[in-house]
């Protein structure tokens, strides 16, 4: 379905409003103005947001919108927008929709022609990336890793060869297990940055090969407390890495030709080193 934003002034607007991830001084002037002006604020946790609004002296009507009710309540909020009410969407901390509720509401509004107005602001993933010292021109945000070890390892194996910098959120009680799984799947030399309690009093940003990082975290239980972001170095292509299409060609040729000849032809077709393909084929056989 095509999505467009309405210029109909009789309809309200949905504002996507980031809130601080720790330091309350990080809220923007524009965010405060919007929160003060809207008719309704849709919040992940109305008690938490109520305290934030109280701190800034803002009196506003709050509407609970969370993972368990979003699909049902999206239509309720859409009706209010169509009546001309302006609504702000906030999460407990950071930018809404980034690992927080809001997707169904935003999509519902866009499909109905309601204008969605995004405000820039705090985001733990981007804040951590900016200080990690890892390539930031291309990165991949993965949210939380699965809760159980098998799921985590399967997820890590699926992105093992991903060259982009990887960003994960992690919880205090799973940090050690996740780091151990990263060591097991990606290897202890993969560089990882742990950013915890960003913008807060005990903010810590520490990077090291993940085997060393795991040992560092184990040394002090305080190092695994708080809100966590893991920034993982992307896979670095090695000279011996072989493209998947070259390996498929090699397998087809091996069925009809001697191994050495098959490796030579596959190498010529794909522009890779003959010896590397030949070595790979020998390893597969033995």
UniProtKB/Swiss-Prot annotation:
SUPFAM superfamilies: Tetrapyrrole methylase
Reaction it catalyzes: cytidine(1402) in 16S rRNA + S-adenosyl-L-methionine = 2'-O-methylcytidine(1402) in 16S rRNA + S-adenosyl-L-homocysteine + H(+)
GO terms for MF: protein homodimerization activity; rRNA (cytosine-2'-O-)-methyltransferase activity
Listed InterPro entries: 4pyrrol_Mease (IPR000878), 4pyrrol_Methylase_sf (IPR035996), 4pyrrole_Mease_sub1 (IPR014777), 4pyrrole_Mease_sub2 (IPR014776), rRNA_ssu_MeTfrase_I (IPR008189), RsmI_HTH (IPR053910), SAM_MeTrfase_RsmI_CS (IPR018063)
Major subcellular location class: cytoplasm
Keywords for this protein: Cytoplasm, Methyltransferase, rRNA processing, S-adenosyl-L-methionine, Transferase
Stored Pfam families: RsmI_C, TP_methylase
Enzyme Commission number, as recorded: 2.1.1.198
Subcellular location: Cytoplasm
GO cellular component: a single term: cytoplasm
Top class in the EC scheme: transferase
Gene Ontology BP terms: rRNA processing
Family, as annotated: Belongs to the methyltransferase superfamily. RsmI family.
Function: Catalyzes the 2'-O-methylation of the ribose of cytidine 1402 (C1402) in 16S rRNA. In vitro, active on the assembled 30S subunit, but not naked 16S rRNA or 70S ribosomes.
Name the record gives this protein: Ribosomal RNA small subunit methyltransferase I
Biological source species: Escherichia coli (strain K12)
Lineage, top ranks: Bacteria, Pseudomonadati, Pseudomonadota, Gammaproteobacteria, Enterobacterales
Gene field: rsmI
């Amino acid at each position: 379905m095509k999505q467009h934003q309405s210029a109909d002034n009789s309809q309200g607007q949905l504002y996507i409003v980031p809130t601080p991830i720790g330091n309350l001084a990080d809220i923007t002037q524009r965010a405060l103005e919007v929160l003060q002006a809207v008719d309704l604020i849709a919040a992940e946790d109305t008690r938490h947001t109520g305290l934030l609004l109280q701190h800034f002296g803002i009196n506003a009507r709050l509407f609970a919108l969370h993972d368990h009710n979003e699909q049902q309540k999206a239509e309720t909020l859409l009706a209010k927008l169509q009546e001309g009410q302006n609504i702000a969407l906030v999460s407990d901390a950071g930018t809404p929709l980034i690992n927080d509720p809001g997707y169904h509401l935003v999509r519902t509004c866009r499909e109905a022609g309601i204008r969605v107005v995004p405000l820039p602001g705090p985001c733990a993933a981007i804040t951590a990336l900016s200080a990690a010292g890892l390539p930031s021109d291309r990165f991949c945000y993965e949210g939380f890793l699965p809760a159980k070890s098998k799921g985590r390892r399967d997820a890590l194996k699926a992105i093992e060869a991903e060259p982009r910098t990887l960003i994960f959120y992690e919880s205090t009680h799973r940090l050690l297990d996740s780091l151990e799984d990263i060591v097991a799947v990606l290897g202890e030399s993969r560089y990882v940055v742990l950013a915890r309690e960003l913008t807060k009093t005990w903010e810590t940003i520490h990077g090291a090969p993940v085997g060393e990082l795991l040992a560092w975290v184990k040394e002090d239980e305080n190092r695994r407390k708080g809100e966590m972001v893991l920034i993982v170095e992307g896979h670095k292509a090695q000279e011996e890495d072989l493209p998947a299409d070259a390996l498929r060609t090699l397998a087809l040729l091996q069925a009809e030709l001697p191994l050495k000849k098959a490796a030579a032809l596959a190498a010529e077709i794909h522009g890779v080193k003959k010896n590397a393909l030949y070595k790979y084929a020998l390893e597969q056989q033995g």
